[in-house]
């Protein structure tokens, strides 16, 4: 079994404050990254998108497209050898299917390529219980997550039905937007990664985040987690803090309808243990941080290091991310930040919420049934443990989320 690798684990976690970051513009694509696995991912995505650009878009996907893969082995790689390993393998799963999904989610392949290859992805200090590591594309539009070989197998199991569901809902969903799945091999280290759209905004900073399952047993962030700059808090933290999501009736109705439909689909596939990821942007707090950043930048003026601020690198004028006019505080582009919802007028604070379902690849199999039996013995039959069957899980999940929206 392949386990998640150390994709950039040696790099310090990036700060979450609204502070200007810098990167060295890569005029020629050098795929420069601190981790050779990241360099190979950048190289592979660039190669894949270039190859796909020469393949005619089919009228419809065929059954074989859901089993297909493309792979390349590179030996004695001499070009750009100071940045790239000399021996590596890159494999892309179901390239035609994921290209079709990107299109249905309104993502242009050229923009996707730019986001993942113009500058190295940034390390993210989030870490799943499974040990998965996360990176964010430099422009914060996409999340790169290490997964296991079992996750890859489960993804293949559900991909056909997932694609059909995305077609039927016209890409309007709270489910993860799966955009690409790859295997990377460098110096005998093999990892699998999946790329999804970032739930959070690429420009509005999140000051508080929650992972909610609708369960209360062992659902509190650890002291170690709470010590982080942006900890991932859980159900009991949400309840104990008296937190609420303040959205108007229309937004609440639309959100819950989407959530119900998505969760029913997951229950049909016998999937469970998923969460609602919630990120909260505080408009006034962000404005204050922006003022402080501008004051600090004024003090640092004249200390140029030859680098450019994060955004569109000088050689990529076509990147649509920054081509639109500047937005006012608390405003966002719904075509990019697709999960954003503004608070209602009577909210105690001016906030923007980013909410979507994550971690949907857990199938209710014999292992989960055994875990459920063990936890029932430990906590009692009435306890709200997370390992219940998919139908129970979905009902409890929907009930909990319905109660936190006000």
Swiss-Prot record:
Expressed ubiquitously, with high levels in the brain. Present in most tissues, except notably skeletal muscle and small intestine. Its main location: membrane. It catalyses: a 1,2-diacyl-sn-glycero-3-phospho-(1D-myo-inositol-5-phosphate) + ATP = a 1,2-diacyl-sn-glycero-3-phospho-(1D-myo-inositol-4,5-bisphosphate) + ADP + H(+); 1,2-dihexadecanoyl-sn-glycero-3-phospho-(1D-myo-inositol-5-phosphate) + ATP = 1,2-dihexadecanoyl-sn-glycero-3-phospho-(1D-myo-inositol-4,5-bisphosphate) + ADP + H(+); 1,2-dihexadecanoyl-sn-glycero-3-phospho-(1D-myo-inositol-5-phosphate) + GTP = 1,2-dihexadecanoyl-sn-glycero-3-phospho-(1D-myo-inositol-4,5-bisphosphate) + GDP + H(+). Phosphorylated in tyrosines. Phosphorylation is induced by light and increases kinase activity. One of its GO terms (molecular function) is ATP binding. Residues 289-304 have a biased composition (Acidic residues). Changing residue 251 to S: No effect on kinase activity; increased accumulation of lysosomal cholesterol. InterPro entries: PInositol-4-P-4/5-kinase_C_sf, PInositol-4-P-4/5-kinase_core, PInositol-4-P-5-kinase_N, PInositol-4/5-P-5/4-kinase. GO terms for cellular component: autophagosome; cytosol; lysosome; nucleoplasm; photoreceptor inner segment; photoreceptor outer segment; plasma membrane. The keyword Transmembrane does not apply. SMART domains: PIPKc (SM00330). Changing residue 131 to L: Abolishes catalytic activity. GO terms for biological process: 1-phosphatidyl-1D-myo-inositol 4,5-bisphosphate biosynthetic process; autophagosome-lysosome fusion; megakaryocyte development; negative regulation of insulin receptor signaling pathway; phosphatidylinositol phosphate biosynthetic process; positive regulation of autophagosome assembly; regulation of autophagy; vesicle-mediated cholesterol transport. The modification Phosphothreonine is found at residue 3. Residues 59-65 are annotated as: Required for interaction with PIP5K1A. CDD domains: PIPKc_PIP5K2A. Keywords: Acetylation, ATP-binding, Cell membrane, Cell projection, Cytoplasm, Kinase, Lipid metabolism, Lysosome, Membrane, Nucleotide-binding, Nucleus, Phosphoprotein, Transferase. Residues 33-405 form the PIPK domain. Residues 288-329 are annotated as: Disordered. PANTHER family: PHOSPHATIDYLINOSITOL 5-PHOSPHATE 4-KINASE TYPE-2 ALPHA, PHOSPHATIDYLINOSITOL-4-PHOSPHATE 5-KINASE. This is Phosphatidylinositol 5-phosphate 4-kinase type-2 alpha. It comes from Homo sapiens.
């Amino acid at each position: 079994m392949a386990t998640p690798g150390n994709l950039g684990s040696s790099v310090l976690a990036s700060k979450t404050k609204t502070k200007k970051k810098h990167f060295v513009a890569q005029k020629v694509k050098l795929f420069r990254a601190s981790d050779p696995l990241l360099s190979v991912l950048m190289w592979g995505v660039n190669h894949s998108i270039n190859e796909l650009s020469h393949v005619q878009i089919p009228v419809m996907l065929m059954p074989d497209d859901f089993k297909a893969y493309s792979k390349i082995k590179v030996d004695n790689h001499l070009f750009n050898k100071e940045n790239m390993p000399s021996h590596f393998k890159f494999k892309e799963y179901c390239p035609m299917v994921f290209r079709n999904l990107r299109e249905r989610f309104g993502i242009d392949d050229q923009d996707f390529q730019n986001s993942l290859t113009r500058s190295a992805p940034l390390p993210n200090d989030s870490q799943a219980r499974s040990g998965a590591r996360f990176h964010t594309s430099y422009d914060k539009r996409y999340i790169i997550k290490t997964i296991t070989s079992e996750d890859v197998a489960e993804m293949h199991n559900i991909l056909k039905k997932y694609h059909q569901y995305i077609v039927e809902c016209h890409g309007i969903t709270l489910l993860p937007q799966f955009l690409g799945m790859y295997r990377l091999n460098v110096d005998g280290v093999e990892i699998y990664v999946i790329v999804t759209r970032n739930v959070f905004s690429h420009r509005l900073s999140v000051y508080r985040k929650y992972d909610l399952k609708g369960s209360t047993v062992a659902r509190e962030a650890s002291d170690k987690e709470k010590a982080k700059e942006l900890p991932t808090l859980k159900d009991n933290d949400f309840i104990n803090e008296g937190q609420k999501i303040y959205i108007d009736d229309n937004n609440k109705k639309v959100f819950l309808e989407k959530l119900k439909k998505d969760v029913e689909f997951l229950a049909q596939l016998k999937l469970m243990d998923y969460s609602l990821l919630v990120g909260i942007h505080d408009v006034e707090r962000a404005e204050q941080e922006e003022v402080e950043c501008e004051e600090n930048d004024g003090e640092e003026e004249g200390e140029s290091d030859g680098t450019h601020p994060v955004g569109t690198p000088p050689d990529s004028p076509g990147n649509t991310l920054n081509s639109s006019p500047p937005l006012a505080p608390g405003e966002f582009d719904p075509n990019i930040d697709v999960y954003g919802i503004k608070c209602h007028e009577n909210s105690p604070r001016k906030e923007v919420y980013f909410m979507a379902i994550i971690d949907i690849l857990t199938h209710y199999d014999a292992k989960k049934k055994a875990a459920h039996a063990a936890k029932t013995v430990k906590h009692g039959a009435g306890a709200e443990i997370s390992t219940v069957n998919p139908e129970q899980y979905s009902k409890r999940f929907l009930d909990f989320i319905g109660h936190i929206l006000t």
